[in-house]
């Protein structure tokens, strides 16, 4: 028994780890790279499309690139080796919070996000919230999220 292998679903095992690995998203990558390079990031990004086009993957790559300590300045690729990149990849980064809105549809779930938004980042430069399947939120949960989307605290980014 040399090493215990950890099971990963295929979607996570082969999830792109660099912007160049995003197939069919060249224009999006160019726009995001320019925004990151010029330090002109929006406080929120809405990524839309059919299932499987890479919305969540893109949000995670943005988070990795923004908080990466050794980011390639030319093309904004995250290094994948710094503490921030490794912890984002392993879903243990305290500054990248991913919420599945399909399972957490209520106002209390969104209020938990709103409470976390006010805290400063721990490891990286930004605290990033990825709200997956946001269309599943209840109307009251959307209303609770609206003010935070309109006026987010400094150093916080929200991807929905």
Where are these regions (language model features)?
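P-loop/Walker A NTP-binding region and its immediately flanking N-terminal helices
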Residues: 1-157
């Amino acid at each position: 028994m040399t090493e215990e292998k950890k099971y990963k679903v295929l979607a996570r095992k082969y999830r792109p780890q660099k912007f160049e690995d995003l197939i069919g998203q060249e224009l999006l990558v160019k726009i995001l790279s320019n925004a990151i390079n010029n330090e002109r990031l929006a406080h929120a990004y809405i990524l839309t499309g059919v299932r499987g086009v890479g919305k969540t993957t893109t949000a995670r790559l943005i988070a990795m690139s923004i908080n990466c300590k050794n980011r390639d300045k030319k093309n904004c690729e995250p290094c994948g080796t710094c503490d921030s990149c490794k912890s984002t990849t392993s879903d243990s980064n305290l500054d990248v919070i991913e919420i599945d809105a399909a399972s957490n549809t209520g106002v209390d779930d969104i209020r938990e996000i709103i409470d976390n938004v006010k805290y400063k980042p721990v490891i990286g430069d930004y605290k990033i919230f990825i709200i997956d399947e946001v269309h599943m939120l209840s109307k009251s949960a959307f209303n609770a999220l609206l003010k935070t989307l309109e006026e987010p605290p400094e150093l916080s980014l929200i991807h929905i």
